Amino acid sequence: MKIIIIGAGISGLTVAHELVKKGFEIEIYEKDNEAGGMAKSFRNKNNIPTEHSWRGYGPFYYNFFEISKQIPINIRENFNEYTLDEVKEHNTENDLWCIYKNDVYDLTDFVKSHPGGSIILQAGGKNLEDVWDEYGYEWHNDNENVMNTLNKFKIGVLVESYSSKSVYDNLNKNRLNFEFWYNKDNDKKSHSLDYLDFLYLFFLFGKVILSDDRKINYFKVRLYPLLKGKLSKPGYHYITDYIAGPGYGFDKNTMSLGHFATFIEYTLYQKEKKWQVMSMPTSEAWIDPWVKHLKNLGVKFYFNHELIKINKKKDKIDSLLVKHKNKVIKLNSDDYVISINPFNFNDILKKSNMMEMSIMYNKLNIVNNQISFRLGFNKKINFEIKNGGFVLVDSPYNITFYPQEDHWINVDLGEIKTLLSGTLILPYRKGSLYGKSGLSLKLDNLKEEIIHQLFECDVFTNLCKKSDVSKKNIIFKEIYNDWYEKDGYLVTKNKKWVNNFINEEYRPLQKTDLENLFISGSHCKTSISIWSMESAVESGKITSNLILDKYNKENCYYYKHQSIPIVKLLSKLDNILYKLHFKNLVIEMIIIIIFLFIKG
């Protein structure tokens, strides 16, 4: 069976990944000259790596974790290679080597100061994970402090498993730490929740988490008005400036109660709640190895091929038309998967006279205009926290950024010593330099506006002074190359879609009414309900399983995000209340508690 996939973003690549393993013939057509969609990075003409935006990987990204472990890589490391037999020879107190996740460590100098005493001697020439399991120290695995100490003693890699490294190993193992900066250094606001804040948030989020049938209603309610005036000032700033704001790339003005409560729920379920970033540019760490792996499995890629029309015949797709170098090519297949952003897809639907489906996509038509930028300094800015991500709370464009060099490993930046990769979360607001929105400025003016807003912040300015850095040290300024000037405004070649209180209920299913047309992407319905790389992978897996079901083939692995058993049980009880037109379970529980308290 032949499958044609339109779009080589995360979701399209996921479909190819899952189906090629099941024996399908896969062809991918992509309008750009490289894969990755919104996640891709690239290197400019000066070989400086650049990202669409800084990209965080949450602790509940289980579908991403699973698929990333299947993508082999060759990690470029400046370390020696050792065989397992060589490591086994170093097993004494005065010469002690060990292995951890295929890396080789010389712990000889650490033996005497090891807080666990002589247990470390048992690791000589062995796999540390096995020793920790044997002596009850499993918690050492991926513990941040343990890993930081261990990495000081790394001397090489294990030859036998060098090629078995995966994309998952390219994740920076350290936690991404956020810090809030205000324009006035003495205007620091406390970011914390008091017990009344916790009670209110428990009530607010509990209504969502402990619901099922009525949950969709909470995705239509804006979060921001529910917090204003209800939380303490420190609590309010903690939520809006961080969790429901630029800290995680959300627009607080369009975030719904349902999305935020879901985000909190899935985070709370995790034993370790850290967010991570890649240890090198995203395409080099993930996308490029993935494409190479898929090609090795037989997937055929056709870049610079843009879908222009869908030819429908009764209840099936007859063919697709794609454009390549001014030439129109007709494509035929058994099944078709459209994995492009909903805005471009809607344009195709209209051109193809598929108006019934287009009407549904019209309801998704809310563009998220976050703009990505890079600033390179020829002197190092010494940030006071490790592995930091920074939020300029008072900046008109709600700027968030992080220094790439603190997170990337062995990535040559040339003359650049500090490379800030950032995002304008709210570029539609008026800037403080030109008094215009970022979307109505020319590209060069926008760069100057960003620099101006950065240096308006006393915290950033003082940090630069301590590092002997000024605006004169900026040698590289860039707006992500998807953006260009048109009719006095900035527009992007690839529009970004995110779910919010307006469009959540209109997210489409992966299966269409046409028997051989499927769609995939993070705009489709997923169990995670949060626009993210995880939802893109999940959507790809859902689409893959629909096609596998069609041909009676075994399904691929798919992690369905869901509540823990006790929460699921209470949600089902709330369904009964909902059918009886009672209020939410949380409210009813509070009423019962108050009644019992008064009666008692």
State the predicted function of each range:
Residues 546-589:
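Active-site-proximal substrate-binding core of FAD-dependent oxidoreductases
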Residues 185-193, 198-316:
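Active-site/ligand-binding neighborhood in enzyme catalytic cores
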Residues 43, 56-79, 161-177, 234, ...:
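N-terminal FAD cofactor-binding segment of flavoenzymes
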Residues 267-278, 321, 333-335, 340-508, ...:
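C-terminal segments that line or cap access tunnels to active or ligand-binding sites in enzymes
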Residues 78-163:
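B-type heme-binding environments
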Residues 2-27:
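N-terminal Rossmann-like FAD-binding beta1-loop-alpha1 element of flavoenzymes
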Residues 20-43:
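Glycine-rich FAD pyrophosphate-binding loop
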Residues 311-331:
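Conserved beta-strand-loop-beta-strand element in the redox core of flavoprotein oxidoreductases
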